[in-house]
Amino acid sequence: MNKTKLLKVLFYLNIAVVVGLIGYKVYLNLVTSEFEAEHTEQLSDISARLEGQDSYSFAVVGNINNSVGIFERRIIPMLNDTDIDFLVSAGNAVSSGGEDKYRAIKGTLSRLDMPYLLTFGNNEYEEFGSFRFYDHYGPHFFSFTADDSRFIFLDSTGKTPWQWQLRWLTDILKADDSKHRFVFIGHPP
């Protein structure tokens, strides 16, 4: 008889956990605000911010996921107290590709007083994260120019074949006369 009661309790606990997880997923998708193509907005902000300037500066951070608390409490206030024009994350801004992780990093980065761009890294790729990254931020590899510099973001996760990216990169660089080129990649291929 005790075994039956224990199994009933475990069954109802499992049901409660499943209902809780489903409720959380529904909350994430219906209640929290949607965001998409964030890089488009960030690139517009970078262009507007740099317009008419003779020079600019940017900061590069990596693996925000390892210390989100420190990043929020110490790094963001320090960055906001500088004249830095924009921030680049060199990959692994999220701890996994889950929807909740993307929403959390959006909340964290919204505390910055400057535009930001993310490099598509291994953690962004995990748990179907590549689809979320594409929906929330944009393509896994892209480039933009600022003054006499070209900024190039590549996908080293294997999601986008290297041959495709190298062809794209070759075409861009053939027509590019930028004085400086900055390449961001989550990790060496």
Task: List each model region and its residues.
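Solvent-exposed loop/turn segments at secondary-structure junctions
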Residues: 64-67, 93-96, 122-126, 157-160, ...
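N-terminal Sec-pathway targeting helices
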Residues: 1-18
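Active-site neighborhood of phospho(di)ester-bond hydrolases with catalytic His/Asp-centered motifs
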Residues: 60-62, 86-92, 115-122, 154, ...
